[in-house]
């Protein structure tokens, strides 16, 4: 009997040991860097190839290239920036330098020129040959054609020059310097450059004379250009041009525009603008000499070129005047099209150097930017004698901080103008009275949309935005016709310019300008076209516009679930295109744009929709014929989160992603979106760790409404155990039920998978607000949710914590003044005192914070002097005597959203009251942590804090004793206190 007992005991011990060995380990802080995610994703135009990047949080990722049928796969370490040629014959991509090499260079503080450089990868998708080119800055492909590409090297090779005969030939003038027009590299076996002793048949020496106004010569501070390589793989041509600083393809690939610089060792070479003609394989010179070229543009057909050039001033001049230069096919060289003296130019206005010109689709119009000339800077003034002062005036359009924050943008502000390319007629369209202009029909429209908020800017201080006057602008004359005044809404113009239309936030409808009247076109719809759950004290935002039908014949808009068809003439009653199927089943249908090049829908076009079930959070894809109203055909729907749908240009081949809370995002391919083939698998190491499950939970909140949230449980969850719990919240999070959450050092949000893996339950409750009582709403939903979980029997009511960042941080701070339920609280960037925060500045934008309380997220809905009691009631600072929960505050001294003195107010008050409180100030950090080292640091501190108070582990020294300033940078306080 004794022997049997010993034997059975041995078996039990062995089985228990095996069970323990099989247990999955919890996540720790070492896992972050290698955790993977999907990055770029593309499908070849013919639908036969896909490519995507797999990125890691810190380190080197991979580029994966696969046949659509999964029959072939290539993996390229560090590949990114991928693009297929339009004929699907090649894939080009960049290859990053190794992360370790870049990090080493940063540590050694090497010069930028000596940093490790990217390379270029080229795959021939027909032969599967692979080419790697080192030291490449960029590569470019024509948008709409194939057969050619170009890449820009970061290196300049030693070069002797000779002039190409196919350059434009202009008669020599021996009284002026003559300069070589273009140089071609001639490689020898040692990859050195030397002069060829014999000219090829298509080459001869020629010169071009300098411009008549003798342009200035750039100084040494202008970077010298580097080699540009042009490849015509259809004809086996490969040419290298040195000293290139910029380049641009025409959409059809017929021409390549090049900008070249002077050479440090050959100052007779002048900066130039050139074009390479693909058909003739030759270079033409458009312009030689100048201080600065910029804003290059080519028309859609590759027949016209325009750019800005500054050629007249000294290189270091404080005032420069740019001109618009223009070339069309057949011209011997570029000519001036517009300058500051052109007829129609406003007095004392100039061509803006900060606006890149562009052609209309037809090429008949060239759009450019102009601006008032800036006053000449007085260089006689000595900086140390200048007073540094901001003068705030009560009639300023914008507050001084807003002006200063946007100073660079304002200095670069440009006003749209156009010039007719055939006649050269110039026309100013926008100006300081009407600064915004939206063109239509790709620049060829008969009317444009003008917008002005000039009369309403002051009220942005408390409104958060501005009302707008809306104009119809005639591009032929510049005449403006007022359409609607003081609109609180969203103005738009139809693709073909037939209609100016808008959503009116106050009247809550869509309206269209028809003839001389403004016509509401959605008033016949009984369901709301605006956010039904909007709970801020301002007008609700619309669900939005889907698209116009071709010829501007119909407008499609969304309600919460369905798609509506509106007649812009108001003659046909609005039609529910999806027949109310969405609302009936709580499914929202949203169009997925699978052809970004087209800005309208065609009659009888089959469109693809993402469908999302609001009740169970399932998602998938559906399709319908836009010309046949009816129930969308569901293609796939399930307990996953789908997205990223891409369609091949020339085939019914689709690429998309699927993910779940327990499975990383994966790339899928499909021919019909009904069945899909999984193409990628990442984060296989997850199988070694105790992961998490996620489920929806409902309970009755204290305001009497049914509340919803997500409960995250450990994979090895045992309902017989009592778990510590952390509630994490912001506003509403439950729609993300199936989103995959990677373990990562966060900007200061809760690292949910990390804590769940280590034995915590996490509750993410949705919060519904009532105007004037945001703090009470947080209490009603968070506390009721926590207690509802306690009733389930597997949450320890004495070991519960709360965590939130920003708006969530404020709610954490408020909740602990209302209850002692929680044993630990963590508040990132909280507002403690609404009365002092109300008049503060959001330094990142320069905006005053008043709008946030009166109209936006803080949801008070009144000014401080109208309802001061609400500001006090909702401010944690005034109720801190009741606090018993230990609190950690993160308040960073470069926070541009919540003034960090809010954290100081809360910390110093709790310290004065002898309440347990800590504050973390990451020096120089923003509202949300940016630097990865700081994100890693805060993850460790959050774990130590919650483990101490919710798991009973020993505290670390920063919690027990703090970190004195004298030890800053030497002692981080992570060590465990052993006494």
Model-found features: residue ranges?
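Bacterial Sec-dependent N-terminal signal peptides
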Residues: 1-24, 831, 840
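Cap/lid segment of the alpha/beta-hydrolase catalytic domain
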Residues: 524-533, 673, 681-799, 803-806, ...
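Catalytic P-loop NTP-binding/switch module of NTPases
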Residues: 676
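Active-site-proximal cap/loop segments of hydrolase catalytic domains
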Residues: 742-979
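Short strand->helix junction
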Residues: 263-264, 312-314, 716, 734, ...
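Hydrophobic/aromatic beta-strand patches that form the interior of the parallel beta-sheet core
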Residues: 230, 427, 449, 668, ...
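Beta-propeller folds
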Residues: 12, 21-653, 659-663, 669, ...
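Glycine-rich His-Gly loop
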Residues: 453, 612, 659, 728-732, ...
């Amino acid at each position: 009997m004794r022997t049997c007992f010993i034997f059975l005991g041995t078996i039990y011990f062995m089985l228990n040991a095996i069970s323990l060995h099989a247990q999955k380990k919890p996540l720790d802080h070492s896992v972050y860097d290698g955790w993977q995610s999907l990055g770029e994703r593309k499908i070849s135009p013919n639908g036969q190839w896909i490519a995507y990047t797999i990125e890691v949080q810190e380190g080197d990722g991979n580029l994966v290239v696969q046949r659509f049928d999964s029959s072939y796969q290539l993996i390229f370490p560090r590949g990114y920036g991928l693009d297929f040629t339009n004929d699907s014959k090649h894939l080009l991509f960049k290859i990053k330098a190794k992360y370790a090499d870049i990090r080493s260079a940063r540590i050694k503080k090497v010069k930028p020129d000596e940093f490790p450089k990217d390379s270029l990868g080229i795959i021939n998708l027909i032969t599967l040959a692979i080419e790697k080119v080192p030291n490449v800055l960029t590569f470019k492909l024509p948008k709409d054609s194939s057969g050619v590409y170009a890449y820009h090297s970061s290196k300049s090779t030693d070069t002797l020059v000779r002039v190409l005969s196919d350059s434009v030939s202009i008669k020599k003038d021996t009284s002026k310097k003559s300069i070589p027009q273009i140089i071609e590299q001639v490689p020898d076996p040692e990859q050195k450059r030397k002069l060829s002793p014999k000219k090829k048949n298509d080459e001869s020496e020629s010169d071009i004379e300098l411009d008549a106004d003798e342009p200035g010569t750039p100084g040494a501070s202008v970077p010298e250009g580097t080699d540009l390589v042009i490849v015509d793989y259809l004809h086996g041509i490969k040419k290298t041009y040195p000293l290139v600083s910029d380049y641009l393809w025409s959409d059809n690939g017929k021409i390549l525009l090049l900008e070249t610089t002077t050479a440090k060792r050959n100052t007779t070479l002048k900066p130039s603008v050139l074009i390479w003609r693909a058909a003739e394989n030759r270079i033409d010179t458009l312009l030689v000499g100048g201080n600065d070229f910029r804003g290059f543009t080519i028309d859609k057909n590759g027949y016209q070129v325009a750019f800005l050039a500054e050629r007249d001033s000294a290189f270091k001049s404080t005032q420069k005047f740019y001109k618009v230069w223009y070339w069309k096919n057949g011209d011997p060289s570029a000519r001036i099209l517009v300058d500051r003296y052109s007829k129609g130019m406003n007095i004392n206005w100039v061509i803006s150097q900060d606006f890149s010109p562009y052609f209309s689709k037809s090429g008949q119009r060239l759009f450019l930017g102009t601006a008032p000339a800036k006053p000449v800077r007085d260089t006689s003034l000595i900086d140390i004698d200048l007073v540094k002062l901001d003068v705030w005036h009560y009639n300023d359009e914008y507050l001084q901080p807003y002006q200063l924050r946007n100073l660079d943008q304002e200095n670069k502000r440009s006003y749209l103008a156009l010039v007719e390319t055939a006649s050269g007629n110039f026309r100013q369209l926008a100006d300081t009275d009407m600064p915004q202009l939206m063109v239509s029909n790709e620049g060829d429209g008969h009317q444009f949309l003008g917008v002005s908020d000039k009369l309403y800017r002051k009220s942005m201080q408390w409104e958060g935005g501005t009302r707008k006057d809306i104009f119809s602008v005639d591009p032929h004359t510049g005449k403006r016709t007022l359409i609607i005044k003081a609109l609180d809404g969203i103005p738009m113009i139809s693709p073909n310019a037939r209609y100016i239309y808008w959503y009116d936030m106050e009247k809550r409808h869509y309206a269209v300008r028809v003839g001389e009247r403004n016509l509401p076109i959605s008033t016949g719809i009984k369901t709301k076209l605006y956010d039904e759950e909007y709970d801020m004290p301002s007008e609700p935002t619309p669900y939005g516009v889907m698209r116009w039908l071709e010829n501007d014949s119909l407008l499609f808009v969304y309600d919460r679930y369905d798609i509506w068809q509106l007649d812009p003439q108001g003659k046909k009653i609005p039609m529910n295109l999806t027949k109310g199927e969405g609302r009936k089943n709580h499914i929202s249908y949203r169009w997925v744009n699978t052809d970004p090049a087209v800005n309208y829908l065609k009659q009888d076009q089959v469109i693809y929709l993402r469908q999302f079930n609001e009740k169970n959070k399932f998602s998938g894809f559906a399709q319908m014929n836009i010309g046949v109203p009816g129930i969308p055909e569901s293609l796939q729907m399930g307990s996953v989160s789908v997205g990223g749908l891409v369609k091949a240009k020339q085939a019914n081949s689709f690429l998309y992603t699927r993910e779940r809370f327990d499975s990383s995002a994966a790339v899928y391919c499909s021919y019909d979106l009904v069945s899909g083939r999984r193409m990628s698998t990442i984060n296989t190491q997850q199988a070694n760790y105790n992961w998490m499950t996620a489920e929806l939970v409902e309970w009755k909140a204290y305001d009497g409404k049914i509340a919803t949230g997500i409960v995250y449980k450990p994979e090895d969850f045992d309902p017989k155990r009592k778990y510590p719990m952390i509630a994490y919240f912001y506003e509403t999070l439950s729609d993300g039920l199936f989103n995959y959450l990677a373990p990562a050092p966060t900007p200061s949000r809760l690292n949910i998978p990390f804590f769940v893996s280590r034995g915590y339950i996490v509750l993410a409750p949705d919060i519904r607000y009532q105007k004037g009582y945001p703090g009470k709403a947080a209490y009603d939903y968070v506390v009721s949710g926590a207690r509802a979980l306690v009733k389930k029997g597997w949450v320890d009511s004495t070991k519960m914590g709360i965590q939130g960042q920003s708006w969530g941080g404020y709610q954490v701070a408020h909740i602990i003044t209302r209850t002692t339920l929680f044993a630990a609280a963590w508040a990132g960037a909280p507002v403690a005192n609404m009365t002092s925060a109300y008049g503060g500045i959001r330094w990142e934008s320069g905006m005053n914070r008043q709008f946030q309380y009166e109209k936006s997220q803080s949801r008070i809905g009144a000014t401080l002097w109208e309802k001061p009691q609400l500001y006090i009631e909702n401010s944690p600072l005034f109720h801190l005597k009741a606090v018993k929960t230990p609190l950690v505050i993160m308040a960073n001294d470069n926070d541009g959203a919540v003034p960090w003195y809010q954290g100081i107010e809360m910390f110093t008050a709790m310290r004065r009251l002898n309440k347990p409180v800590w504050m973390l100030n990451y020096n120089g950090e923003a509202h949300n942590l940016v630097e990865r080292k700081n994100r890693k640091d805060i993850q460790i501190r959050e774990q130590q804090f919650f483990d101490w108070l919710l798991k009973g582990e020993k505290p670390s020294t920063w919690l027990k004793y703090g970190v004195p300033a004298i030890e800053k940078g030497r002692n981080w306080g992570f060590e465990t206190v052993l006494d």
